């Protein structure tokens, strides 16, 4: 995916980069697979802010993605490659031989007209979905399940890929994009290949307007707030407050360990932090 740059006729245009949507084949999504999406503004059902810095943004329609890939043994052809405003990866529309249509995440190398299939007897090629026990060790995968039949939960963002390292009894060792090696039930399914739109992490937003268009609001420093709004707020001028940096909820924001000491995740073989064992 090429990235477009612009002549610096304004200060922000100097740094802005935009994705080249040359791989997109249609602008109109499949109507049957689209539903409305209500904005929350980061609030829960009682109106309290659960996630800060969310609000506004362009209206979106939600594309229903098939993360379960449960149509075993039914071949499908790639009909379109489309833009999805709800994720940073592209999606592609599959036309199944029985007439069904479904969206999946678009992996690198999958083209219009290619045939894909899911199931234990599927071929090891890009876009196919198989249980981990049927995938050779060393294969790069994406759209990985954590629980059998629940649907893909891991490795779904643009450019990401995991690697199947080993198989042992009822579990497979999978190396995640973060470097963490964890156990996954060997009956869980995963898709072959790397998620597309690999150059997404090189895109520079460049100005505030693009950020607001995406529904992201500004992040205000705590020291710039009033004392009633933040533990580090208040004072005259640029006041340091004489205390350690704290979060808006008065927790020390640097170095405080929040994970319970008795917690143990035995499914983490090697932690992403300096390759520690899971604790």
Swiss-Prot record:
Keyword rRNA-binding assigned to the entry: answer is yes
NCBIfam families with a match to the protein in the record: rplB_bact (TIGR01171)
| Record organism | Elusimicrobium minutum (strain Pei191)
Keyword presence, 4Fe-4S:
no
| GO-annotated molecular function | rRNA binding; structural constituent of ribosome; transferase activity
Q: Function, please?
A: One of the primary rRNA binding proteins. Required for association of the 30S and 50S subunits to form the 70S ribosome, for tRNA binding and peptide bond formation. It has been suggested to have peptidyltransferase activity; this is somewhat controversial. Makes several contacts with the 16S rRNA in the 70S ribosome.
Q: How does it assemble?
A: Part of the 50S ribosomal subunit. Forms a bridge to the 30S subunit in the 70S ribosome.
Q: Which UniProt keywords apply?
A: Ribonucleoprotein, Ribosomal protein, RNA-binding, rRNA-binding
Name under which the protein is recorded: Large ribosomal subunit protein uL2
The family database entries (InterPro entries) matched by this protein are listed as: NA-bd_OB-fold, Rib_uL2_dom2, Ribosomal_uL2, Ribosomal_uL2_bac/org-type, Ribosomal_uL2_C, Ribosomal_uL2_CS, Ribosomal_uL2_dom3, Ribosomal_uL2_RNA-bd_dom
Q: Which PROSITE patterns does UniProt cross-reference here?
A: RIBOSOMAL_L2
Family the entry assigns? Belongs to the universal ribosomal protein uL2 family.
Coiled coil ranges? none
List the lineage, top down.
Bacteria, Pseudomonadati, Elusimicrobiota, Elusimicrobia, Elusimicrobiales
- Membrane-spanning intervals of the chain: none
Report one GO cellular component: large ribosomal subunit
| Region Disordered, annotated ranges | 224-279
One GO term of the biological process aspect: cytoplasmic translation
């Amino acid at each position: 995916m090429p990235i477009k740059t612009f002549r610096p006729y304004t200060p922000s245009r100097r740094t802005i980069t935009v994705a080249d949507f040359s791989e997109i084949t249609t602008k109109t999504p499949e109507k049957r697979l689209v539903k409305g999406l209500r904005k929350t503004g980061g609030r829960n059902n009682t109106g309290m802010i659960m996630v800060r810095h969310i609000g506004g943004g362009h209206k979106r329609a939600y594309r229903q993605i098939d993360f379960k890939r449960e149509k075993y043994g039914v071949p499908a052809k790639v009909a379109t490659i489309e833009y999805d405003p709800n994720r940073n990866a592209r999606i592609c529309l599959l036309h199944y031989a029985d007439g069904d249509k479904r969206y999946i995440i678009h992996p690198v190398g999958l083209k219009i007209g290619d045939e894909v299939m899911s199931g234990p007897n599927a071929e090891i090629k890009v876009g196919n979905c198989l249980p981990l026990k049927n995938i050779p060790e060393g294969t790069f995968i994406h759209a990985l399940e954590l629980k059998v039949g629940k649907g893909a939960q891991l490795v779904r963002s643009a450019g990401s890929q995991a690697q199947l390292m080993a198989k042992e009894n009822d579990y497979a060792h999978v190396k995640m994009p973060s470097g963490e090696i964890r156990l996954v039930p060997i009956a869980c399914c995963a898709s072959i290949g790397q998620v597309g739109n690999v150059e997404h992490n090189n895109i520079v937003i460049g100005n505030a307007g693009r950020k607001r268009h995406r529904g992201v609001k500004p992040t205000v420093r705590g020291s710039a707030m009033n004392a009633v709004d933040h533990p580090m707020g208040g004072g005259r001028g640029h006041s340091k407050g004489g205390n350690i940096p704290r979060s808006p909820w008065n927790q020390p924001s640097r170095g405080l360990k929040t994970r319970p000491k008795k917690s143990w995740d035995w499914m983490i073989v090697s932690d992403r932090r300096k390759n520690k064992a899971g604790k």
